């Protein structure tokens, strides 16, 4: 289940977001047993969730984008006063076109523990290069009360992959993803780390419980119950990589199934096999 949650960091002087989730109105995924990823159903729109925490868009001062994909960057335009920090290698991505106030991160502050390249964003908040999932993938670490909170974007989709030391989601650079995974695991073994994934319920549970990741003692997996009986077929398909929605009504009525086999996602260039029913 491809849950995508994002994080707010309130320093007392600033309100900092890590990613901004899917855009408002994004369609629910249609569960299919053969689909590579189930995008899931919306629980709450991102901006509504932020308002429920007591924050207005104008209060947000910085947004730290782990990577370009639409399920992490969907609401960037909703924050008029925020500087948007993103790895300079992601600049120019279709998902970031026409986004104002982007600050390219050049990792000018040297090493952060065993990670060779980092940039300090605020007191106790660090932007760290973590290439692999995308060429510009990054992770964020926030230090608080002796703990290291790691907001890792899509280095893993689920904690089970981290425990098993397996690469699960790599789109751009397999070798770099392996190096990043090795560094993440090394860091966790030596520093008390709360591992906050965006695509698993364990991310929220780890954060709420301040649960320090122990690689030798995995937390038991609780499988979600999914109803595969399905709703009516809308004819729409969504890219499981970048969130691009294919709607036949916007393409002269051409059904997704009738597109040529060599057709690619207009945004991220992934093949048809990466699309799920919406």
Q: What do the PLM-derived regions correspond to, one by one?
A:
Residues 38-55, 59-71, 83-131, 135-207:
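Metallo-beta-lactamase
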Residues 232-235, 261:
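Short metal-coordination and nucleic-acid-contact micro-motifs, chiefly zinc-binding Cys/His arrays
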Residues 239-242, 265-268:
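Short cysteine-rich clusters marking metal-coordination/redox-active sites
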Residues 251-263:
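Short linker/helix segments within small regulatory modules
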Residues 1-48, 139-153:
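Conserved beta-strand hairpin/beta-sheet module of binuclear metal-dependent hydrolase folds
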Residues 245, 249, 262, 271-274:
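Cys/His-rich metal-chelating microdomains
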């Amino acid at each position: 289940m491809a849950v995508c949650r994002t994080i707010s960091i309130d320093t007392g002087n600033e309100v900092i977001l890590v990613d901004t989730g899917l855009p408002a109105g994004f369609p629910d995924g249609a569960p299919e047993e053969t689909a590579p990823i189930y995008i899931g159903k919306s629980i709450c729109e991102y901006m509504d969730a932020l308002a429920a925490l007591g924050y207005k868009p104008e209060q947000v001062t910085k947004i730290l984008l782990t990577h370009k994909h639409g399920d992490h960057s969907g609401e960037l335009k909703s924050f008029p006063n925020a500087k948007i920090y993103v790895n300079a290698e992601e600049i120019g991505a279709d998902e970031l076109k026409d986004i104002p106030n982007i600050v390219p991160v050049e990792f000018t502050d040297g090493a952060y523990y065993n990670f060779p390249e980092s940039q300090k964003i605020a007191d106790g908040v660090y932007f760290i290069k973590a290439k692999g999932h995308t060429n510009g993938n990054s992770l964020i670490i926030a230090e608080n009360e002796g703990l290291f909170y790691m907001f890792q974007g899509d280095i893993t989709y689920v904690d089970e992959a981290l425990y098993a030391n397996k690469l699960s989601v790599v789109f751009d650079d397999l070798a770099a993803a392996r190096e990043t995974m090795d560094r993440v695991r090394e860091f966790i073994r030596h520093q008390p780390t709360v591992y906050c994934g965006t695509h698993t319920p364990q991310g929220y549970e780890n954060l709420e419980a301040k649960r320090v990741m122990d690689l030798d003692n995995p937390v038991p997996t609780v499988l979600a119950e999914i109803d595969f009986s399905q709703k009516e077929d809308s004819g729409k398909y969504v890219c499981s990589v970048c969130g691009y929605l294919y709607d036949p009504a916007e393409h002269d009525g051409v059904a997704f199934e009738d597109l040529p086999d060599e057709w690619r996602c207009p945004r991220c260039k992934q093949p048809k096999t990466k699309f799920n029913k919406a």
